[in-house]
Amino acid sequence: MMKVKVAINGYGTIGKRVADAVSLQDDMEVVGVTKTRPDFEAKLGAKRYPLYVAKPENVELFERAGIEIQGTIEDLLPKADIVVDCSPNKVGAENKAKYYEKAGIKAIFQGGEKKDVAEVSFNALANYDEAVGKSYVRVVSCNTTGLTRLIYMLKTNFSIGRIRATMLRRVVDPKEDKKGLVNGIMPDPVAIPSHHGPDVKTVLPDVDIVTTAFKLPTTLMHVHSLCVEMREAVKAEDVVSALSEEPRIMLISAEDGFTSTAKVIEFARELRLRYDLYENIVWRESIGVDGNDLFVTQAVHQEAIVVPENIDAIRAMFELAEKEESIRKTNESLGIGKVF
């Protein structure tokens, strides 16, 4: 079987993880990655993958730094069947207009891009089939991925009504040193809704959801607190049972020491490379029912949760596998599933 040739444009927080995940699959391979600047990530990336320069005008910088490059993004794209764009917010749309459309290449974009950059916004559990055969797909953001997975499982197993979700957002990724929030809690935005609810509706258009969001001075994970109106009587144990059937949702317990996101990440450091958590991390004790309202609290590792979604999007776009088969293969390759 011919493997799908994948280019990664942007070998950063998401890009390097997607590259490594692609390398674990038996039906796709990395043909090259790009960097804009000759920094330490570029030096390490060049040791693992063919390295190309994302901005052709920066070639001389790489040469002066002594980093071996194979060319520019314009040299890479003809060697690939698809490009996974992991550029900063809004740069993906620029790359589409400047490079991808001209090269006639399929492309996957990340959640920082506007929805109209692609033909479909994607989550493997919720709408895999909508991406089948498409040329441009947008994998929704880390927060939206976490919300969508959980809501999809709830609406698949129960009759649900209005959803209210509060997003407690990490302020920046751990490596960022140019911005942040050292002391304070920032409503983001102050007015409702935050963008997360409308973004969920790009994947699950029939969901009634409103979200608010706050930035907190932490870098480890996001936390979501959901209140879901249930249209039928339900017990907490029924929800626990339903969620436990989905490998991409990990149920944890405070009784086991998971008392904060710090403890969750410490667990992840023992579990996987780069302490990556691809799953929604749901506190079992947080699942509770009060009248018609279901409450759930989950944590989302923003650096990793979208990685399996990118892999499944590639399979859908090239019609390599049906939904269940793709998700199974991705889960097995990344070690997603029962941990305890």
Swiss-Prot record:
* Keyword annotations: Cytoplasm, Glycolysis, NAD, NADP, Oxidoreductase
Q: What is its EC number?
A: 1.2.1.59
- Swiss-Prot/TrEMBL catalytic activity: D-glyceraldehyde 3-phosphate + phosphate + NADP(+) = (2R)-3-phospho-glyceroyl phosphate + NADPH + H(+); D-glyceraldehyde 3-phosphate + phosphate + NAD(+) = (2R)-3-phospho-glyceroyl phosphate + NADH + H(+)
- Which residues hold D-glyceraldehyde 3-phosphate? S141, C142, N143, H196, G197
What is the protein name for this chain?
A: Glyceraldehyde-3-phosphate dehydrogenase
Location of the active site: C142
What species is this protein from?
A: Archaeoglobus fulgidus (strain ATCC 49558 / DSM 4304 / JCM 9628 / NBRC 100126 / VC-16)
Quaternary structure, per UniProt, is: Homotetramer.
Top enzyme category: oxidoreductase
Q: Spell out the family assignment given in the record's similarity comment.
A: Belongs to the glyceraldehyde-3-phosphate dehydrogenase family.
Q: How is this protein annotated for GO cellular component?
A: cytoplasm
Kindly tell me the pathway this chain contributes to. Answer: Carbohydrate degradation; glycolysis; pyruvate from D-glyceraldehyde 3-phosphate: step 1/5
Q: Entry's SMART domains?
A: Gp_dh_N
A single Gene Ontology MF term assigned here is: NADP binding
Q: What is its main location?
A: cytoplasm
**Cytoplasm as a keyword?**
yes
Taxonomic lineage from the root: Archaea, Methanobacteriati, Methanobacteriota, Archaeoglobi, Archaeoglobales
- Pfam families tied to this protein: DapB_N (PF01113), Gp_dh_C (PF02800)
Example GO BP: glycolytic process
